[in-house]
Amino acid sequence: MEVARAVADRASIAYILQKRPLGLGHAVWCACELVCYEPFALLLPDVLVQCKGKGCLAQMLDVYEAHGGNIIAVEPVPDAQLHSYGVVGIGEGNGSVFPINGMVEKPKPGTAPSNLTILGRYILQPEIFDILSAKETGTGGEIQITDAMIRLLATQDFHAVKYEGRTFDCGSKLGFLLANV
């Protein structure tokens, strides 16, 4: 409870209601006016990130300060599970930071550009809203944030951060249980 009070004293929290489930890209687009066309961090709440040392977003902010552009936290996943995630293709990097040269949402088996998956932590530039405003649907008939990022990649730099830590996908029963053990 002390943590909640400390955060409440220093933060302003707002929410936007997505009236229809049209995809993550649509949910982000719904927040456009709240973000006021500024760079922003997007943290998906169904992914719990347990880091060693510095938090995941803090690691990402360090990369943002050094490189600017768009930053995505990634983690390696076994090849058999890649079809369930957004996957990035990367160039030469320096340990835990890599330039992104491609992305694909839920690739078919054997077509993923790497084993690095997007884990639900992003720092994005506001031009993403221009792309999302077209409301083009992608995988599953939804407005996908990954599809919008692929288009933005044509004009802006993206970097992947292989954060130090572990994630729990609380959107699955097993992930939720593991997060609570």
Each language-model region and where it sits:
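Conserved alpha/beta core of the MobA/IspD/sugar-nucleotide pyrophosphorylase nucleotidyltransferase superfamily
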Residues: 37-39, 90, 96-101, 113-181
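Short beta-strand segments
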Residues: 17, 42-44, 73-76, 162-163
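Short, conserved clusters of charged catalytic residues that mark active-site
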Residues: 26, 55, 144
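A short acidic, often aromatic-flanked loop/helix-cap motif at beta-alpha or helix-coil junctions
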Residues: 20-24, 79-80, 109-111, 167-169
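Hydrophobic helix-cap positions at the C-terminus of alpha-helices
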Residues: 34, 63-64, 152
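A generic structural signal for alpha->beta connector loops
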Residues: 10-12, 67, 155-157
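Conserved core of the sugar-phosphate nucleotidyltransferase
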Residues: 48-130, 135
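Conserved N-terminal catalytic core of the sugar/cofactor nucleotidyltransferase
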Residues: 1-44, 48-52
